[in-house]
Amino acid sequence: MRQGKCHNFECSTAARGTVVDVPDGSEFRCPECGSDLRKVGAWHHLPAAFVVFLIVQAAFFGFSGWEWAFGAPRKTSSRTEGSVILRLAGSNTIGSGLGPALAEAFLKQQLQASDVRVQAGAVAEETNISGLLPGAHSRSVITIAAHGSATAFAGLAEGKCDIGAASRKVKPDEARTLSALGDMTAFASEHVLGLDGVAVIVNSTNPLTSLRVDQVAQIFSGAVTDWAQVGGKPGPITIYARDDKSGTYDTFKNLILGSNALVSTAHRYEDSNQLSDAVANDANGVGFIGLPYIHSAKAVAIATTGARPLLPNLLTVATEDYPLSRRLFLYTPENSPNRLVRPFVEFALSKAGQDIVANAGFVSQNIRLERAVAPADAPKAYRALTQAAQRLSLDFRFRTGKSDLDNKALVDLERMAAFFSDLRYRGEDVLLLGFADNTGVRAVNLQLSLDRARKVNEEFRRRGLKPSLVEGFGPDLPVASNDTDDGREKNRRVEVWLKGATTVAARE
């Protein structure tokens, strides 16, 4: 049996917020209006029914009630005594701060645990988050081992973790190794946790306003040592960088340095605020930093070959247009024996979970309306359409080599439906603007971009939303280089804009 809610605003089932039970094998549609249902995880009903049952189980039979629900617990071997109910492993970017914050909130808010503690594990880069579940006599522990993204997939393959955390996509060979657990690239197993972005900052007196990605790499690897070499005012470049254990450094290394080493003369900092202040006080300084720490320094716009420079901000990172942005992932078996896996992932992707993502210094996927100005080189029709409109903080993108929406887009569709549902708004003023890469003939790319926008329009209408305009702009306004597969994939997108935003804002 599956459960879902209707989000067709003209349907009384949706208006009442009724949860619809759908037998397995039946179409997942509203029985009243026929619209697709938005899936409701079973965990959403636990506090009202199932958790009460488990509390009674625990009260009479000890921990066995929880064991029945979540699988046999494992005793911890760390400094936190108790039984392990969930294991995460992988990325240090996720595991150092965000992972523990999500685990702590999950224990408190979803499992109603008391006396929740966050403690270092017995091994470096490991954390134990524990609490007392209702009716239980011993502590329940969520363990997080943050030893790098590769260990997420190794841990899943070896059965050493329940959820793999990664700051990159699963590689083809890793997916093949894990095929017994399901298709790791499929919707059931690949979950976008949040977005990460890094700003390149200079002194406010530095006249330089933009850099290409390759120039940033040359600067921080020491291949370029004077500002004049990148079009700036002559003067020696002073490098400031975060320490090796920083998630910000991990992101920068993956997106910029790659196999190149950071120049040995770089001044390293453990504190982002201190690094930002150092650049702000050095006329020749340059550094990289998380978005919240730009402060008195100046962020420069970043460009890839053939694409316009973009400044780092919440919108450009949320839409993934900014070159130094990346997705953070959770990977799970298609059918995990641990019944806490799905509830944890659902919580992490929920509005409450995404608020925690934002509080941890990353960019959440909660939808926002943002003021945006069309670039000067945009097509005249594009500028006219988006004038006085607001842009929604997401782009819809597609699976590599296919016309299907990717896994993030599928979740974003539900976020979009909820966003407009909360406003009691049917999307009459929504603009869907499609784009393509530049491979092949322009006329074909114009049609492809329109087809992508129509695909999103179809999904909107299945959810009771009625966009007023669907248009394609072909290869215009690339946000990434068309010389690479990743760049072309980024350029194949659909933007969402909203006319009459003042009317919507008034309803909030």
Question: What are these model-derived regions, one by one?
Answer:
Residues 5-18:
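Short Cys/His-rich Zn2+-coordinating modules
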Residues 6, 30-33:
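Short cysteine-rich clusters marking metal-coordination/redox-active sites
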Residues 63-402, 407-411, 488-490, 503-508:
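Flexible loop/hinge segments at secondary-structure junctions
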Residues 425, 435-508:
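Periplasmic OmpA-like peptidoglycan-binding domain that tethers envelope proteins to the cell wall
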Residues 1-6, 24-25:
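Flanking scaffold residues of small Cys/His-coordinated metal-binding clusters
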Residues 33-42:
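Short Cys/His-rich micro-motifs in 6-15 aa windows
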Residues 42-73:
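Membrane-anchoring helices that localize proteins to membranes
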